Amino acid sequence: MNVPRETIAAIATAQGRGGVGIVRVSGPLAGRAAEAIIGRTLKPRFAHYGPFVDDAGQVLDEGIALYFPGPNSFTGEDVLELQGHGGPIVLDMLLQRCLQLGSRLARPGEFSERAFLNDKLDLAQAEAIADLIEASSAQAARNALRSLQGAFSRRVDNLTEKLISLRIYVEAAIDFPEEEIDFLADGHVLNMLDDVRAELSTVLREAGQGALLRDGMTVVIAGRPNAGKSSLLNALAGREAAIVTEIAGTTRDVLREHIHIDGMPLHVVDTAGLRDTQDQVEMIGVQRALKAIGEADRILLVVDATAPEAADPFALWPEFLEQRPDPAKVTLIRNKADLSGDPIDLQTSVDGHVTISLSARSGGAGLELLREHLKACMGYEQTSESSFSARRRHLEALRHASDSLEHGRAQLTLAGAGELLAEDLRQAQQALGEITGAFSSDDLLGRIFSSFCIGK
């Protein structure tokens, strides 16, 4: 790739005061900057302690300097790191000294961008750096580290290699018709295609769990008025986040609360009670509730266990299942178990539906069952050494690849159209390439790296 030859510099540590602060320099002038600031030639990859001086020889600070000649560095270029005291004034003086020596101020994420452009890491690994820095739980940090070490990229590369092999076979048959390869008769293409589709489905499922751990799961609390939805929100949040009264329709708008369960991020949304109403304000609240239901990763359908309607909770609101047609993402909460006499428990039906009996007001064991259930929904129990971090962008690319393979299979089996299959295979490979950066527009790269910290 065409990598810019300018030398860049930035403060690489977080803003504020600390024991240690780092100024990072990358580019062809890094070695010259090291000699000017330290006053001597630095031995590569060794720590050198001494004063950092300005152009007049005045000491700015003292600390450790590290010099990494390219290509054996993070960016693939010559890199200098100055580790001094972590005061903002001291660090700014060091940075200004580097700029005086010919560097320019780095853009956000430009160090990682140069590492990507110099093939030191791929795009998924570069994004994992930001994910590791921003991780909100230990599990999310571990997943981001595995992605940084290439776990996700290797899965994508393996899929890409299989697609390339399949494309070679298909396109050879198209280009050399005298070989008379019958795609359907020999079954080879279909077997290879189905193998790739199965593996892609597994990667997509695991990436979805990785994205939930990174971004957090949106949990919508829905149900009839006075079912105890706001009490459940307060119980999960551990504070009085919502007003609770005996008056039906107290909650008239969506209320959002961001919480963590064992370090795992959840975005909990309390909604207006679902019912027919003539009140204009409450009607708007119901419409917003239905919209939130449609956007949820998980729905907690709360019913009052003491009410007759609890026997058939999914008949409470006709539009409910229309708004969220996937029943697998609905957890039934039988609330007020302290009044109904229901035992506190979690039950899973033969079709996979989960029902939890609890008392939101009393908390206790029932609330703990719900917390464990939500952790399981996020993949907390399924994480392993093969887990990795993923982003919504990655999921879109994987879905695009999956759709292309499904379309290509239909073209082959229904019409025997090898040419159309070849095009679908090409599109699937391109979609996978967008994950690692093999196929990425400049606009996409700009958006990704601009979200990084300066100095990263």
Curated annotation (Swiss-Prot):
Any Pfam family: TrmE_N
EC number: 3.6.-.-
Binding annotation for K(+): 226, 245, 247, 250
Ligase listed as a keyword: no
Gene Ontology BP, a term: tRNA methylation
Single GO cellular component term: cytosol
Enzyme class: hydrolase
Subcellular location, record wording: Cytoplasm
UniProt: Mg(2+) binding residues: 230, 251
Gene Ontology MF terms: GTP binding; GTPase activity; metal ion binding
Amino-acid positions noted as binding GTP in the UniProt annotation, renumbered to this chain: 226-231, 245-251, 270-273, 335-338, 359-361
CC cofactor: K(+)
Keywords: Cytoplasm, GTP-binding, Hydrolase, Magnesium, Metal-binding, Nucleotide-binding, Potassium, tRNA processing
Residues that hold (6S)-5-formyl-5,6,7,8-tetrahydrofolate according to the record: 24, 81, 120, 456
Chain ranges of the TrmE-type G domain: 216-379
Entry keyword GTP-binding: yes
Cofactor note: Binds 1 potassium ion per subunit.
Subunit comment: Homodimer. Heterotetramer of two MnmE and two MnmG subunits.
Listed HAMAP family: GTPase_MnmE
Function: Exhibits a very high intrinsic GTPase hydrolysis rate. Involved in the addition of a carboxymethylaminomethyl (cmnm) group at the wobble position (U34) of certain tRNAs, forming tRNA-cmnm(5)s(2)U34.
Homology family: Belongs to the TRAFAC class TrmE-Era-EngA-EngB-Septin-like GTPase superfamily. TrmE GTPase family.
Protein name, per record: tRNA modification GTPase MnmE
Organism: Pseudomonas savastanoi pv. phaseolicola (strain 1448A / Race 6) (Pseudomonas syringae pv. phaseolicola (strain 1448A / Race 6))
Taxon lineage: Bacteria, Pseudomonadati, Pseudomonadota, Gammaproteobacteria, Pseudomonadales
Underlying gene: mnmE
